[in-house]
Amino acid sequence: MPPCPPQQNRNRLSQLPVGELGEMELTWQEIMSITELQGLNVPSETSFEPQAPTPYPGPLPPPTYCPCSIHPDAGFSLPPPSYELPASTPHVPELPYSYGNVAIPVSKPLTLSGLLNEPLPDHLALLDIGLPVGQPKPQEDPESDSGLSLNYSDAESLELEGMEAGRRRSEYVDMYPVEYPYSLMPNSLAHPNYTLPPTETPLALESSSGPVRAKPAVRGEAGSRDERRALAMKIPFPTDKIVNLPVDDFNELLAQYPLTESQLALVRDIRRRGKNKVAAQNCRKRKLETIVQLERELERLSSERERLLRARGEADRTLEVMRQQLAELYHDIFQHLRDESGNSYSPEEYVLQQAADGAIFLVPRGTKMEATD
C-alpha cells in the first residue's frame, strides 16, 4: 500500500478505542439515513479516520497505515478512506490490528445532537483540498471491490449500494469540485493510435499499381478477341497470317479457301485493324526516333554555342590588347615628331593617316587626305 499523503493543518491526538469506534459508526449510519430521508445534499464525510469493516468471507491481509491525525475544528478537511459495508451489520468485532496514532479528543465527545448541531462544511473551503505533490497515482474506481481506497468516503459507498450510481456520482462531483494536478487528455495525446496509415498505405499502393499491371492484359485483349472471333467463324488459317502476309500472298491465301461473305468480312476487318495497329506502332517508333535525333541535335548546338561564346570572349580580349598597343604607339610617335620650331605635336590636334601607296602623313584632325594615284 502506498504511504499516506501528508496531512496539513491537523494535530496528532491520542489513540481511539475500538468500542467508541464501533459506536460512532452506528451513529453515523443513523445520521446518513436521516439526511437521505430529508433529501439534503450534504457532504458525506466524517471527522474521524476509517471505521472498522466487518470481516469478509475470505481472509484479509492486515493492512498497515501510517500515523495520521484529525483536527476536530477543521471541519471535514479531507475525505476519509472508503469502506464498503455488507448489507447487515449485527455487531462490530474487535480488530486484531490498530490504525496507528488516530484518535478523537476526550474533552469533546461525539453525540447525535452534537453532530446535528455542528455546522456543515463550507464548499469554498473544500476547494483548498490539495492532492499530494509528486508522481500522480491512478484514481481508484468508485465501483471497485477494494475497501482500502483513500480517495472515497464511506458515504459514497453507501449511496452506491442504496441508490442509482450515476445520479449520486454527479451530486458528489458538484459538492466536491476537486482539481487534479494533471490532465487525462495529454496522456491520451502522448500515445496516439497509428492504426489508419498501415491500412491505407497498401491500398494506395495497390490502387496506383493496379492500372499499370492491367496494361499488358489490355494490349493483348484485341488479339485474343480476334482469335476468338476467328475460331467462332471457323476461319481455316491463323490470324498472324491475316495480318503479316503481303497483299499478293494474302490474296492467294483467300483464293485457296472457299469462304463465305461473313468470313471474308471478318478476315478483312482483322487485317485492317492489324495493319492499323502496325502502322500506329511504326508511327510511334518514328516519333521516338525523331525525338531522339532532335535531342542529340540540341545537345550539339548547345556545345557549339558555348564554343562560339568562348571564341568571342577571346576575340574581345585580343581587340582590347591591340587598342592598348595602338594607343602606346601613337604616344611614342608623337613624342618623336617635332615641328620647325622644335615643338612636339599634340595627339589631340593631329592624327596619322596612311596613303594608298603606304606613305604616312601627319594631318590635323577633321581633315581627310585625298587619295593620290
From Swiss-Prot:
Alphabetically, the GO molecular function entries are: DNA-binding transcription factor activity; RNA polymerase II cis-regulatory region sequence-specific DNA binding; WW domain binding
Where does this chain mainly localize? nucleus
Please list the GO biological process terms of this entry.
bone mineralization; cell population proliferation; cell-cell signaling; gene expression; labyrinthine layer blood vessel development; negative regulation of bone mineralization; negative regulation of cell population proliferation; negative regulation of syncytium formation by plasma membrane fusion
Q: Where is this cross-link: Glycyl lysine isopeptide (Lys-Gly) (interchain with G-Cter in SUMO1)?
A: 368
Show the SMART domains listed in the entry.
BRLZ (SM00338)
Disordered, as annotated region: 204-225
- Region described as Required for interaction with MAPK8: 1-83
Q: Where is this region: Leucine-zipper?
A: 291-298
Ranges where the record places region Basic motif: 268-287
Q: Which InterPro entries match?
A: bZIP, bZIP_Maf, bZIP_sf, NFE2-like, TF_DNA-bd_sf
What are the UniProt keywords, alphabetically? Activator, Cytoplasm, DNA-binding, Isopeptide bond, Nucleus, Phosphoprotein, Transcription, Transcription regulation, Ubl conjugation
Modified residue Phosphoserine is at which positions? 157, 170
What information about domains appears in the record's comments? Answer: The PXY motifs are required for binding WW domains. PXY1 is required to promote transactivation of beta-globin and for hyperacetylation of histone H3, but not for binding to the HS2 promoter site.
Q: What is this protein called?
A: Transcription factor NF-E2 45 kDa subunit
**Species per Swiss-Prot/TrEMBL record:** Mus musculus
The organism's taxonomy opens as: Eukaryota, Metazoa, Chordata, Craniata, Vertebrata
